[in-house]
Amino acid sequence: MKQFILKVCMMLLAVTVTVACGNGAQKGDNAQEGAQTEAKAKTASKTGKAKKAKNTKKKAAKRKKSVFTPASAGAPYEVLLVGGEEDFRTGAVDTLYNILTDDMPGIAQSEPLFKVSRINQAGLSKTLRLCRNIIIIKIDPGQYSTAKFKYSRDVYAAPQIVATIQAHDAAQFKKFVLANSEMITEFFTRAELNRQIDILREDHQPHMREAVRKTFGADIWVPVELNKVITGRNFVWGRCERFVKKVEQELNIVVYSYPYRDVNTFTEKYFVHKRDSVMKANIPGPGEGKYMMTTKGFNLISDEVVHKQYAQVVRGLWNVKDYDMGGSFISVSRVDEKNQRVVVAEAFVYYPNHAKRDVLRKLEAALYTLRLPDELDLERFSYDLDEIIITPED
């Protein structure tokens, strides 16, 4: 088992390998972008601390904004895309825009990964600089020979990411962003997930947390509104039922476990079998013979690294047998080696005919806060997801 996890982790951690296109290769420094702006003076001390961050306490200090730093503007998963007139004319802006607005996986209706606004470089006013996620296109044949992604934190506001993508010309820019489209979108997705984890750190549902401790000897932070907690055999369910603009919305997080057998545990067939059996026993539908089940043919399964360990992440759709009801779910399965079991944290929503991206992402962040029994004893434990690093390759 340990050899399997180690092998997968080594493969997946390679996502941080640097990539680029163009003439030559250079190593990037994520904090260099503010070097020619007045923001450098305001953020230099924070940047220095960030480079020394090696544990949870220092990471928290890195994210703490100065009393003089304004709060960032905009909602989660909103991005401001900035380009020059030539960047609009050559299609460089459109290329990146199309990547950022690609469909979010695991949702029945078409919803973009991000809500993106596009402006000309000259329109980047003091007000717009407060946006939480900013990407600036810099194409200059006289200044750049290599395509590169760089970013700085909390330049004009907090929390904030100000990223730049530089290139020699439009062709090199397009080639770079298309080759690294998944890494670029994942970079900003993880930034937003980590921001939500920071919110959960300060405010989470105590009853769900206590139920997970008693049932599994584990820990989890879920949104405080999930205040209806139901427990069963190796099963805990936190839920929230409410109306948003007169439309019914249900938010749910469940934690359940089953014995770990071998690496074949993490096949799609076995996942669906175990999930359906757990849901049938614990989440009945309205009437006899009705229960939650996994919608076949829509599962997107990926092998990930969560807290330095292997995790199976599944995004898909659920429905109720013989009943017109369904929605989206995301599950994160991890191995509790101490107790030789698989512990699954899953979020699912019911919000018919309305956008689900933001609520599903909010619940997804909570899934990554799950601490297994072995992790509770760690003196230092980081809840944050590892960042995606995009810099030139050899």
Language model segments and positions:
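Signature of long, low-cysteine stretches enriched in small and polar/charged residues
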Residues: 112-171, 279-339, 354, 390-393
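Bacterial N-terminal signal peptides that target proteins for export
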Residues: 1-9
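Start-of-domain marker
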Residues: 32-159
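C-terminal motif of bacterial Sec signal peptides marking the signal peptidase cleavage site
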Residues: 19-20
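Surface-exposed amphipathic alpha-helical segments
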Residues: 174-198, 341-394
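Short, well-ordered beta-strand elements
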Residues: 160-169, 253-257, 341-350
